């Protein structure tokens, strides 16, 4: 298995000036978007990748800001560290099992995370985006889902090169925004492999209409993929930040959840049984198993 470690050494090679407003929905931008949509729609037909197993290493930080104006820096309230077994099977089955979990509280808290905060994003969210088990964000159209060009505008950005031992992969930034900002949608940048039209990176926020919880201020997400077997762009690193306004003892407060994940140790085509994927996507091993996980560092 070869990792695209050079993903960390992204070398910008300017091909054009940054896209201006008049570049939205140019022929070349829409052509690339449609190629990416087509690839995602038919990815399951690629029988070379039937399934995989991987390991995910994650941290969740809960921070708080307190007081009028919320001008003080956030304070760490609680930190959680998690280890997961990650499974995927074509066309889009996902299972994650928490095998290690430890936490430390710096301040009193009774926070309880949504189940999907405890794992990674598979399939780059699929056709629609959902967070907080549907309580925070639900049914937001993915810009690279079928019909994405009817919902979103696209504009080309700069082209970059990811230098691998055997070749260089050209990646182009594809900016995305909704045609109607009053709709539930995302705003951000997609990075697409020009040759294969696979999604390499997503960095985005949501429009206000997407937030179902009225206390939500902002959600920002970055999904980085790595090139494996010189063919498949699969989850490599992910970050999420959720900011929510509230009150604490009648004092204005802001709660911030920050999640950071790294995914590695991929094994391919293990003939995983369908029974493995039954039930909830994210499950936890028994507590004695989680408590006995051999952490690498104190």
What is the predicted role of each segment?
Residues 20-187, 208-212, 218, 242-298:
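Structured extracytoplasmic
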Residues 11-18:
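C-terminal segment of classical bacterial N-terminal signal peptides
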């Amino acid at each position: 298995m070869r990792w695209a470690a050079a993903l960390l050494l992204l070398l910008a090679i300017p091909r054009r000036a940054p896209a201006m407003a008049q570049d939205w929905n140019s022929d070349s931008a829409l052509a690339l978007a449609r190629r990416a949509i087509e690839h995602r729609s038919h990815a399951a037909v690629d029988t070379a990748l039937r399934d995989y197993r991987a390991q995910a290493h994650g941290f969740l930080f809960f921070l708080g800001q307190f007081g009028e104006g919320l001008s003080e820096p956030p304070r760490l309230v609680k930190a959680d560290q998690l280890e997961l077994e990650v499974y995927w099977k074509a066309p889009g089955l996902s299972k994650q099992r928490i095998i290690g979990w430890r936490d430390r509280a710096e301040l009193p808290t009774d926070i309880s995370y949504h189940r999907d905060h405890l794992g990674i994003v598979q399939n780059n969210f699929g056709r629609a985006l959902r967070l907080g088990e549907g309580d925070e964000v639900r049914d937001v159209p993915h810009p690279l889902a079928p019909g994405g060009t009817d919902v979103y505008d696209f504009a080309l950005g700069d082209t970059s090169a990811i230098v691998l031992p055997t070749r260089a992969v050209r990646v182009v930034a594809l900016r995305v925004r909704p045609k109607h900002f009053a709709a539930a949608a995302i705003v951000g940048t997609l990075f697409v492999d020009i040759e294969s039209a696979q999604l390499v990176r997503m960095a985005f926020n949501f429009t206000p209409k997407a937030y179902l919880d009225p206390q939500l201020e902002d959600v920002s997400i970055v999904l980085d993929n790595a090139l494996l077997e010189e063919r498949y762009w699969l989850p490599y690193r992910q970050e999420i930040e959720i900011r929510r306004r509230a009150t604490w003892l009648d004092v204005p407060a802001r709660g911030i959840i920050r999640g950071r994940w790294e995914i590695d140790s991929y094994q391919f085509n293990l003939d995983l049984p369908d029974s493995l994927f039954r039930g909830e996507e994210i499950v936890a091993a028994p507590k004695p198993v989680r408590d006995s996980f051999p952490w690498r560092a104190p």
